[in-house]
């Protein structure tokens, strides 16, 4: 359900951006408006019909939203493989939420093999753009050495970044790590 709301939010943002821009900034303005309206009505077949061509043309927002539909099985059979395909398409274009979701899919391995190195790769890409959940997850990777070399100094860096944005888990974990002796917090060599 959270992904469904997230997709609606991204579609609404795209529609609003197109609606207030003068002159129209994209040939896709009408499609985004129609897709957002169909999404609100839970007419997912129409959403897919409108987003699929945009995604195939390389539109990162459409690619991300199509991934959400495949992940949640909205208007299409649920497919982790197709969801990951579209997340990675959007992620390679720099879309932080798609980068985070690709990392999450590789981390969780739901419907696909786990790959902690790829999870860390995508978490880092999103974390570098300020995505708090990705910063927290990347920090956890460094704290445990999962998919990356264990490095508490790097973990602290990313926990601090996430906590600065109000991420509750990061703040709690940061407090615990800050209590460690300084020697344990030094960068790995």
Where are these regions (language model features)?
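Structural signature of tandem alpha-helical TPR/SEL1-like repeats
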Residues: 40-49, 77-89, 113-122, 149-158, ...
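Canonical positions in the second alpha-helix
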Residues: 53-54, 89-90, 125-126, 161-162
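Hydrophobic face of amphipathic alpha-helices that form TPR/SEL1-like repeat modules
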Residues: 31-38, 50-54, 65-72, 101-108, ...
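Bacterial N-terminal signal peptides that target proteins for export
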Residues: 1-10
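Short helix-capping/linker turns of helical repeat alpha-solenoids
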Residues: 26, 31, 39-43, 56-59, ...
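Terminal, low-structured helical/coil segments at or just beyond the last alpha-helical repeat
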Residues: 3, 24, 28, 149, ...
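Alpha-solenoid helical repeat scaffolds
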Residues: 64-65, 97-101, 133-137, 152, ...
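N-terminal leader/linker segments that initiate helical-solenoid repeat arrays
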Residues: 13-50, 189
